[in-house]
Amino acid sequence: ETVRGAVLSLGIRRMQDIAMSCCLLKLSPSADCPVDVTVFWEHSFACALLAQRFAQKIGYPNPEAAYLAGLLHDIGIIVNLWMLPEEFSAAINQAHASHVPLHEAELDVLGLTHCESGELLAERWKLAPEMIEVIRHHHHPESAREYRALVALVAVNDLMCRMRRLGHGYQEEYLIDFLEQPAFAILLAEFPNLKKFDWARFTFELESHVEEVQQLVTLVYKAPK
């Protein structure tokens, strides 16, 4: 009855999303994997945690959806790693060398980004529409047609993580003014109190969760099989 109650409470679609995320998180990199996949899941866990906390603070009505969206937003990275390992390795090397965002290096090397490949996987696996929208548009939230607040919420926290030691394994060398980001404008239109948001305190909270996230990813990937 407890499981049945949980399913009824969350809804079938949400349970499908959660089950899918669990499957993704148990994917282990092969021995000859050209990059450390755990780095990307550290970023995804951090983004999920921060997105949920941020959602709670600004009054977004569904913090659980924010967590799941943060967790899944970069699944296209795993797709690119599976399908185009050599090309993706070249892209990540270029991103490291140039200190540019990964999606820019992917576009230059692969001709597509993890946003497009992630969208294809999400559609094939029939993830919820809002998750597909986040996966496709989290680097350009202004291009989202639906669920814009959720897309923008994940976009902001993705940037926060990438600027604070929980990115894609390297430091991106460009300055970010969150108040000038399209994602911030989208959120501000819906949550006016965001003008008073304490960014310094929120950044401090992110720093305090770095070790927690790293321990969680280690547990997932290094637990006895």
PLM segments and residue spans:
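Heme-based O2/NO sensor domains and their adjacent alpha-helical segments
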Residues: 1-31
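Signal-transmission/dimerization alpha-helices at domain junctions
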Residues: 21, 54-57
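Metal-dependent nucleotide-binding catalytic modules
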Residues: 28-38, 49-52, 60-65, 69, ...
